[in-house]
């Protein structure tokens, strides 16, 4: 009664068995980005760390990309400046800070949470009372 045992494979080996094209992650990344990787000997040489000169067509292509970025960023800033006026600002931000009822609790809630929950409940009831008062006056905002 002998059982055939399959050799155990590690997770890394198992993962690359199904997808051999992903065996070397760096090569895959370079392939996806469209970059030709340099040989490791080039990276080790300190003398060869200088940038290689660009070809004329590559230089022109990069120059066009940079020029397009300059034009689009200039247009964006002009649009922002033209669209912003004081009248537009007041109309779009009709909600004033006076209307805001904000209470901030600072402290360690873990220390005594019941005290903070009581304060929170009191704040909610006060807000409900304020809302009832404004509804009875048929006002949209408490300060109107």
UniProtKB/Swiss-Prot annotation:
Residues 67-99 are annotated as: Disordered. It comes from Rattus norvegicus. The gene is Tsx. May have an RNA/DNA binding role. Testis. This is Testis-specific protein TSX. InterPro entries: TSX. Residues 72-82 have a biased composition (Polar residues).
């Amino acid at each position: 009664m002998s059982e055939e045992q399959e050799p155990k494979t590690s997770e890394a080996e198992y993962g690359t068995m199904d997808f051999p094209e992903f065996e070397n992650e760096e090569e895959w990344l370079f392939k996806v980005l469209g970059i030709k990787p340099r040989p490791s000997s080039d990276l080790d040489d300190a003398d060869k760390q200088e940038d290689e000169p660009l070809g004329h067509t590559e230089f022109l292509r990069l120059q066009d990309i940079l020029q397009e970025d300059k034009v689009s960023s200039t247009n964006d800033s002009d649009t922002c400046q033209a669209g912003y006026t004081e009248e537009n600002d007041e109309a779009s931000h009709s909600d004033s800070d006076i209307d805001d009822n904000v209470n901030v609790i600072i402290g360690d809630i873990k220390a005594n949470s019941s005290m903070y929950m009581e304060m929170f409940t009191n704040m909610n009831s006060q807000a409900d009372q304020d809302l009832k008062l404004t509804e009875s006056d048929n006002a949209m905002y408490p300060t109107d």
